[in-house]
Amino acid sequence: MIKDNFFNNLFIFICDFMIECRNISKGKAEGELIVSSEAISFLGGVDPETGVVIDPNHELKGESIKDKVLFIPGGKGSTVGSYVIFQMMKNNTAPKAIICLKAEPIIATGAIMSDIPMVDSPSSVEELVNGQMVEVDSDNGKITLL
């Protein structure tokens, strides 16, 4: 009985740190979250050579998204943004994974072309804060807080 309660409580504890989401682009990646409340345009908004946000009006201006897990509401701007994401992958300046509140075709296409795991529609967002380490497992539709 004690053993059963222990494992049941452990399961509940672990599940509290998993967030369900929808798979957009296959894969699994782990990294530090960089969070923005603003949509981002990859064309003209992010330098594909460095992975630094260069849009002068964006709250992440000057921040690098290279090797981070990017959490944004969605994307905006030109369809060329998909190719900017692809160029970032080729330059090793892309984010490790992308989480969106609602995916849109530009970023989704870029993530798929670049083999960047991407999910959207997280069941909870309060835990997703700057600096939090997470694992995005889009194959199984979950984000795990580490």
Predicted regions and their residues:
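N-terminal amphipathic/basic-hydrophobic helices that include classical n-h-c signal peptides
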Residues: 1-17
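Short beta-strand-to-coil "C-cap" segments at the C-terminal boundary of structured domains/repeats
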Residues: 144-146
